[in-house]
Design a protein with these regions (language model features):
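A short, N-terminal "cap"/entry segment at the start of jelly-roll beta-barrel domains
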Residues: 1-39, 121-126, 132-139
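Conserved short histidine dyad/triad with adjacent acidic residue
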Residues: 26-30, 37-57, 88-91
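Short strand-coil-strand connectors
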Residues: 37, 72-74, 99
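Short glycine/proline-enriched turns and hinge-like loops at secondary-structure junctions
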Residues: 57-59, 76-78, 97-99
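Glycine- and acidic-residue-biased ligand/ion/polar-headgroup-sensing regions
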Residues: 58-73
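Short acidic-glycine-tyrosine-enriched beta hairpin
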Residues: 73-93
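Double-stranded beta-helix
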Residues: 93, 99-139
């Protein structure tokens, strides 16, 4: 039966899902999974300053709402208050790079949240050019 659900962000633990080394600086992506079901997922996301993610899409619609800091997606700067709608099958149009203060955002998915990379080899070449090393994470 349909119901209303209330959840507070403080009731969820951060899960570190991506770690990069930018020189000697450790840079992370951390998530709080607020809701997960086959038809919807809601995630509170934190990117440390400089976090760099590959261009990718998802096998569902994906909505981002920027709360704090800034993120650049391809050439588009996304400040607080920006909503980004990535339709099922589309890609972001470039790498995703967190601004100098990092970024906090809410992500909504309407199905599968698995990233679909556009060009993994090009992404790794870009990381090498920038001196960024991916670090394996077990979560």
């Amino acid at each position: 039966m349909p119901a209303v659900h209330f959840r507070h962000i403080d009731d969820f633990d951060w899960k570190e899902v991506i770690v990069q080394m930018h020189g000697d600086k450790r840079v992370t992506t951390q998530l709080k999974f607020l809701e997960m079901s086959p038809t919807r997922t809601v995630i509170y996301t934190h990117y440390d300053a400089g976090m760099t993610l590959e261009e990718h899409g998802h096998s569902s619609d994906h909505v981002l709402f920027i709360l704090k800091g800034m993120v650049t997606i391809g050439e588009q700067e996304c400040p607080p208050g920006m909503m980004v709608l990535l339709e099922h099958g589309a890609t972001f149009g470039g790498p995703i790079v967190a601004g100098p203060e990092g970024c906090e955002l809410i992500e909504f998915y309407t199905g599968d949240i698995t990233p679909v990379p556009k060009d993994r080899e090009a992404f790794h070449a870009m990381l090498d050019e920038r001196g960024i090393k991916q670090v394996p994470v077990n979560f």
